[in-house]
UniProtKB/Swiss-Prot annotation:
Pathway: Protein modification; protein ubiquitination. Residues 35-49 have a biased composition (Basic and acidic residues). Gene3D superfamilies: 1.20.1280.50, YVTN repeat-like/Quinoprotein amine dehydrogenase. InterPro entries: F-box-like_dom_sf (IPR036047), F-box_dom (IPR001810), G-protein_beta_WD-40_rep (IPR020472), SCF_subunit_WD-repeat (IPR051075), WD40/YVTN_repeat-like_dom_sf (IPR015943), WD40_repeat_CS (IPR019775), WD40_repeat_dom_sf (IPR036322), WD40_rpt (IPR001680). SMART domains: FBOX, WD40. This is Probable E3 ubiquitin ligase complex SCF subunit sconB. Belongs to the WD repeat MET30/SCONB/SCON-2 family. One of its GO terms (cellular component) is nucleus. Residues 1-52, 266-287 are annotated as: Disordered. GO terms for biological process: protein polyubiquitination. PANTHER family: UBIQUITIN LIGASE SPECIFICITY FACTOR/HREP PROTEIN, UBIQUITIN-BINDING SDF UBIQUITIN LIGASE COMPLEX SUBUNIT. GO terms for molecular function: ubiquitin binding. The lineage of its organism: Eukaryota, Fungi, Dikarya, Ascomycota, Pezizomycotina.
Length: 678
C-alpha cells in the first residue's frame, strides 16, 4: 500500500471516530443524531450545532431528560406525581461528612450567588429554544452521580478548543479555593491561626467578618502574648515587656470596687483619671498571676434584691488580648529602635549614687546626705528625707517603707510618704554601700568586708564572712533562701542562709565587681550560644558536689535533684534552687553572664571604655552605665549591644530598669528617665 493510501486511511479513521464521539455526545445531551435521519451541519455553522437540541420537540426532551432526572433525583423530580421514595443509602447518609470522604454523598458545595445571578441574566438574554437546551444540559449534569459527572466533563473538554480550555483553567483556579477557616470547627481554626505571626493575623482579620471574629479572638492573641510578653519568642526572636503595673493596679481596684463597695448611687466604675491621681494604695506588690488581672471575671457581685444584674455596671469588663499585645508591641518597637522621651530631674547638690522608681514615684540618694522623692509624671520634687550624716550609697522602697544605707555606717527605715525616719540600725563597722530586702529579709554589704543579714520577723541578725574587700552589692532570693554578693576582691559569692556558709564563689573578673543581678527564673538561654571561658575558675563549698555533675548526669536544668546536687545536700527536693542565671559588672569594663548551677561564665559583654558601675537586667535586656558616661542596652542572649545613650556629663553610677522605662543617676547630680511608652 502506498504512502498516500495510508494517509487517506488515517484521515477516514479519524473522521469516523470524531463522528462517533459527536453522535455519542449529542445523544447524551438530548441532541439529534445521524440515526434520526438528520445531516450534520458544516463546521462553518458551529453555532447551530451547539443548540441543535433546541429544535427537538418537547416530547423528545421529555423522553430523554425526564427519566434520567427521575432516576437520579427522585426526591426532587417526580413527573408522574408518584410518591418519591429515597434510596436507603441516600436517606441514611450523613450530610455532615465531606463528600470526598463519603463516596455515597453528593457534592453539596454552595453556589456563588453573584455568579448564579450573572448566569441567569445571560441565560434570559437567549432565545427560548436555546434556554431550554442549556437548561436540559444543566439539569442532566446536576442530577448525574459523581461517576457520570466525570464522564460528562471529559466529553465536554474533549471537544473544547484551546481558548475554551484556557477559560476553564482560569475559572477553576478560583473555584477550587475554599474558605477553610469558616468551614472548619472553631477549635481547628484557632489551632491554625495560632501558627501565624502578628502581621499575618492582622491580614487574616481583614478577609471577612467571619475571619475577623476568629483572628481577633482572645484564644489566638492570648497564645501570642504567652509567646512574647516577658520572654523572647524562640520562633521570631521578639520579646515584649510586661503589662504596666500601674494600669494593672487600677484595673484591680476597679474590680474590687465593683465587687465589694457597690451602692445604688454609683452609676459606673471610677474613671482612669481619678485612679491615676490617687497615690499607691499601700497594698502588697502584684504577684505574677496578676499580670492578666484585666481579664479576670468578677464573680462576687452583690446579690441584693432589686439589683439589676444585667446593667452596664455589672457587666464584666475585659481588655482584649489583642489590645494588650498591641500596647506591648508598640513599647517593644520603641525599645528596639531607641524611640523614647527623656525627662531630667535636678535638685541634688552632689553625685547621685542610688535610685529606684515604681509607678510614678522616684527615689534618689546622693552624696549630699539626702534622699529625694519625685513625681515622675510632673517632675516635681515631693519631699526630701534628711537624717544621714554622710553620703547615701544605697536605697530600696516598697509601698510602705524606704530603707537606705549610708557611709555613716547606719541603715535607716523611713516612711517615705511623710518623710519620717522610723528606725535606725547599726551593726556595720564601716560604711553601708549595698542593700537589698525581700519579704522580711534584709541583706547589707559594707566597707567592713561583711554581708549582714537582718530578719524583721524574729529580730535576728548574723554576718556572712568570706570576702577580702569591700562588699559593693547584695541580692536576696527568699524562695531559695540564698544571697548573692559582689566585692572589690573581684569575686561574686553565693551564700546559703540556712547554713550561713558560702556555697559557690565565681571567679573571672579582673577588676572590682560592682554589681550582681540575678535574672528572673523565666529567662532562657540557648546553651549552644554559650562562650564558656572559665569552667574551672568557680569553686564550691566542701559539702557541694562538683559543678559538672548536672551536665554529666544529663539532668534538666531546673530538676530538683540536679539542683540539689549542684548546690549541696542542704537543697533537698522541697527547697527551691537559686536563680539559674545572673549578670555582673566590674571595673574591668566588662559585663558577664553566669550560670549559677555550674559556675560557668556563659558570655562576656565588651563595649564600655571604662569601668561599669551600674547594672540593670530582666528577661529581655541588660542596661549598663559606666565611668565613660555612656548607657548601653544589651541583648543577653546574643551579647550584642543594641543601643548606646549619652547625655550625662559625669560617670553613670546607678540604673533603675522597668518594663517601658529606665532611669540613670550620675555624678553630674542629675537623674535622667528614658520612657519608651508610645
Amino acid at each position: 500500500m502506498s504512502t498516500e493510501d495510508n494517509h487517506d486511511s488515517q484521515i477516514l479513521t479519524a473522521r469516523h471516530r470524531s463522528d462517533a464521539s459527536e453522535q455519542s455526545f449529542k445523544s447524551l445531551f438530548g441532541g439529534p443524531s445521524s440515526e434520526d435521519g438528520k445531516e450534520t451541519e458544516p463546521d462553518t455553522h458551529d453555532h447551530n450545532h451547539s443548540f441543535s437540541n433546541a429544535k427537538a420537540p418537547a416530547k423528545f426532551a421529555n423522553q430523554n431528560v425526564a427519566p434520567f432526572l427521575a432516576r437520579h433525583i427522585p426526591e426532587q423530580y417526580a413527573p408522574l406525581g408518584a410518591q418519591s421514595i429515597l434510596p436507603a443509602d441516600l436517606s441514611s447518609a450523613n450530610s455532615k461528612y465531606c463528600y470526598r470522604h463519603r463516596p455515597d454523598q453528593k457534592c453539596r458545595r454552595q453556589a456563588d450567588e453573584p455568579s448564579m445571578d450573572k448566569l441567569q441574566r445571560e441565560l434570559e438574554s437567549l432565545p427560548q429554544g436555546d434556554q431550554q437546551s442549556i437548561s436540559h444540559v444543566w439539569s442532566l449534569f446536576s442530577a448525574a452521580p459523581a461517576k457520570h459527572r466525570k464522564l460528562i466533563l471529559q466529553g465536554i473538554m474533549a471537544q473544547c478548543c484551546f481558548p475554551q480550555l484556557s477559560y476553564i483553567s482560569a475559572t477553576v483556579r478560583d473555584l477550587i479555593r475554599i474558605d477553610f477557616i469558616t468551614a472548619l470547627p472553631p477549635e481547628i481554626a484557632f489551632k491554625i491561626l495560632c501558627y501565624l505571626d502578628t502581621t499575618s493575623l492582622c491580614k487574616a482579620s481583614q478577609v471577612s467578618r467571619g475571619w475577623r471574629a476568629l483572628a481577633d479572638d482572645d484564644v489566638v492573641w492570648h497564645r501570642m502574648c504567652e509567646q512574647h510578653i516577658h520572654r523572647k519568642c524562640k520562633k521570631c526572636g521578639w520579646g515584649l515587656p510586661l503589662l504596666d503595673r500601674k494600669r494593672l493596679r487600677e484595673s484591680k481596684r476597679e474590680i474590687e470596687l465593683r465587687a465589694t463597695t457597690w451602692d445604688k448611687g454609683v452609676v459606673g466604675p471610677r474613671s482612669p483619671d481619678a485612679s491615676a491621681e490617687s497615690p499607691p494604695s499601700g497594698k502588697r506588690k502584684l504577684e505574677d498571676d496578676e499580670v492578666a488581672v484585666v481579664k479576670r471575671h468578677c464573680s462576687s457581685l452583690g446579690s441584693d434584691a432589686g439589683v439589676d444584674k444585667d446593667s452596664d455596671f455589672f457587666k464584666t469588663r475585659y481588655r482584649p488580648w489583642k489590645e494588650v499585645y498591641k500596647d506591648r508591641f508598640k513599647v517593644g518597637t520603641n525599645w528596639k529602635y531607641g524611640r523614647c522621651s527623656i525627662k531630667t530631674f535636678k535638685g541634688h547638690t552632689n553625685g547621685v549614687m542610688c535610685l529606684q522608681f515604681e509607678d510614678n514615684i522616684l527615689a534618689t540618694g546622693s552624696y549630699d546626705t539626702t534622699i529625694k522623692i519625685w513625681d515622675t509624671e510632673t517632675g516635681e520634687e515631693l519631699r526630701t528625707l534628711r537624717g544621714h550624716e554622710s553620703g547615701i550609697r544605697c536605697l530600696q522602697f516598697d509601698d510602705t517603707k524606704l530603707i537606705s544605707g549610708s557611709m555613716d555606717r547606719t541603715i535607716k527605715v523611713w516612711n517615705w510618704r511623710t518623710g519620717e525616719c522610723i528606725s535606725t540600725y547599726t551593726g556595720h563597722r564601716g560604711g553601708v554601700i549595698g542593700l537589698h530586702f525581700d519579704a522580711s529579709i534584709l541583706a547589707s554589704g559594707s566597707v567592713d568586708k561583711t554581708v549582714k543579714i537582718w530578719n524583721f520577723e524574729d529580730k535576728s541578725t548574723f554576718s556572712l564572712r568570706g570576702h577580702t574587700d569591700w562588699v559593693n552589692a547584695v541580692r536576696v532570693d527568699t524562695s531559695s533562701r540564698t544571697v548573692f554578693s559582689a566585692s572589690d576582691d573581684c569575686t561574686v559569692r553565693l551564700w546559703d542562709l540556712d547554713t550561713k556558709t558560702c556555697i559557690r564563689t565565681f571567679h573571672g573578673h579582673v577588676g572590682q565587681v560592682q554589681q550582681v543581678v540575678p535574672l528572673p527564673r523565666e529567662f532562657e538561654f540557648e546553651e549552644h550560644d554559650a562562650e564558656c571561658e572559665n569552667d574551672d575558675l568557680s569553686t564550691t563549698s566542701g559539702d557541694a558536689d562538683p559543678p559538672s555533675i548536672q551536665a554529666s548526669m544529663g539532668l534538666e536544668p531546673n530538676a530538683a535533684y540536679s539542683q540539689s546536687s549542684a548546690f549541696g545536700t542542704s537543697f533537698d527536693n522541697g527547697r527551691a534552687a537559686p536563680p539559674r542565671y545572673m549578670v555582673t559588672s566590674a571595673l574591668d569594663s566588662t559585663i558577664r553572664l553566669w550560670e549559677t548551677t555550674t559556675g560557668r561564665c556563659l558570655r562576656t559583654f565588651f563595649g564600655h571604655l571604662e569601668g561599669v558601675w551600674a547594672l540593670g537586667a530582666d528577661t529581655l535586656r541588660i542596661v549598663s552605665g559606666a565611668e565613660d558616661r555612656m548607657i548601653k542596652i544589651w541583648d543577653p542572649r546574643t551579647g550584642k549591644c543594641e543601643r548606646t545613650f549619652t547625655g550625662h556629663s559625669g560617670p553613670v553610677t546607678c540604673i533603675g530598669l522597668g518594663d517601658s522605662r529606665f532611669a540613670t543617676g550620675s555624678e553630674d547630680c542629675e537623674v535622667r528617665m528614658y520612657s519608651f511608652q508610645s
